[in-house]
Swiss-Prot record:
Subcellular location: Cytoplasm
InterPro entries associated with the record: GrpE, GrpE_coiled_coil, GrpE_head
Keywords: Chaperone, Cytoplasm, Stress response
Biased composition (Basic and acidic residues): 1-10, 32-42
Protein name (database record): Protein GrpE
Compositional bias ranges of the Low complexity kind: 12-30
GO terms assigned for molecular function: adenyl-nucleotide exchange factor activity; protein homodimerization activity; protein-folding chaperone binding; unfolded protein binding
Keyword Cell division appears in the UniProt entry: no
Superkingdom of the organism of origin: Bacteria
Organism: Pelobacter propionicus (strain DSM 2379 / NBRC 103807 / OttBd1)
Subunit and interaction comment: Homodimer.
Region of interest: Disordered: 1-42
Length: 190
């Protein structure tokens, strides 16, 4: 039985040897310069592939870093200004409380005035905790970034482009404008 296996191995090994011999004979037939040239071409191809992979790695790493920065910036924006829409809805309530206070003061309703003042103060304090601050407009120079001009008043009492009267308060949310102040602006008399 051992002889039989050995003969099978010999018969299967013979075709492999025949197949390998043309390759080895071609390799042996190539001159050393041709082999060096072929190896240099292979090396150049691998170096080019390596450079492409390195460039791709650098680009992907930069993309990842940009993604991280953008995500952090968006997260910070959300934390700082995520309450903006809620606060915009609360501002008309503050305006109405202020109107009620001015009306109650004119009519002399002290009990009602004190209650509304207390509610108004609590609401302003709650808004302040979220970073909402009123814009100071009286006597300030007109700034279209923070003020909305409703009327122009020709006057000598105030320099031109100065806020004369405030119709509705403006508010900032941290450093961003939440709502512009509605104002009248002084102009030079004609």
């Amino acid at each position: 039985m051992k002889k039989h296996v050995t003969e099978e191995q010999k018969t299967s090994a013979a075709p492999e040897a025949e197949q390998a011999s043309p390759e080895s004979s071609a390799a042996e037939a190539a001159t050393p310069e041709e082999r060096i040239s072929r190896l240099e071409e292979q090396l150049a191809a691998k170096e080019a592939e390596c450079r492409e992979n390195w460039d791709r790695f650098v680009r992907e790493r930069a993309d990842l870093e940009n993604f991280r920065k953008r995500s952090n910036r968006e997260k910070e924006e959300l934390l700082n200004y995520g309450t903006k829409s809620l606060l915009e809805e609360i501002l008309p309530v503050v305006d109405n409380l202020e109107r009620a206070l001015s009306h109650a003061n004119e009519n002399g309703s002290t009990g009602l005035t004190e209650g509304v003042q207390m509610i108004h103060g609590l609401l302003l304090n709650a808004m302040k905790k979220f970073g909402v601050t009123p814009l100071e407009t009286s006597g300030a120079p007109f700034d279209p970034s923070f003020h909305q001009a409703m009327t122009q008043i020709p006057t000598d009492e105030h320099p031109p482009n100065t806020v004369v009267e405030e119709f509705q308060k403006g508010y900032l949310l941290k450093e961003r404008l939440l709502r512009p102040a509605m104002v009248s602006v002084a102009t030079a008399p004609k």
